[in-house]
């Protein structure tokens, strides 16, 4: 006998009724987000879309750490890639008052006198402030100590801890490249802008990094960098790098 889940039956009904959008919720361990970057890649196109209304990465003790924040970044990179299916997303829960919490993690904690944004908050802010309406396909070649990580089964555990995306804002004509490195060592990759920019361009780089279990990591001060059409980047261990690039 073939058993179907409520999830499968719900989606089948939504498509049959031509429901415009379905609200999905899930809370998972960091490893789930690392291993399910293709979660929406095989969703049916051109029909019912997804509103990811609640999601969060839950680590040991349900703390909001750099690890959980970076795995959420990896997931949001996959959401950008599948923007034709995922119409919207929102982290949950958002706010929690100390002494009156229903659960952890939450995105922003507060009491009567203080506010404590989490690492996850900073990741969400970097994505929301650097959104786009067009997606540009990306491909990453990874290098560590002169050693290439080929795209095969042997190196799959390494490559799964790395994700990248490029979106373009048509109104501002700015491209944003987001690169998440969940590996515990520096990785070199090459950014090829080809015909998107002139010979060189001044871009803005913001990096969020720190100890993998840090609960108070914050983005570094944005810095101006010069990018050529082909630029080698060194990505810090356990980091999210955001490049804001004005196009020609």
Question: Model-predicted segments: where are they?
Answer:
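Short, small-residue-biased leader/transition segments that mark boundaries at the very start
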Residues: 1-2
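Distinct, well-ordered alpha-helical segments
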Residues: 6-15, 191-193
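Generic recognition of flexible, low-complexity loop/linker segments
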Residues: 8-12, 37-41, 75-79, 112, ...
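A structural signal for beta-strand and strand-to-loop patches characteristic of beta-rich domains
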Residues: 116, 120, 126-150
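Carbohydrate-binding surface patches
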Residues: 157-199, 205, 241
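Acidic, Ser/Thr/Pro-rich beta/coil linker or hinge segments at domain junctions
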Residues: 196-237
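Short beta-strand-to-coil "C-cap" segments at the C-terminal boundary of structured domains/repeats
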Residues: 243-248
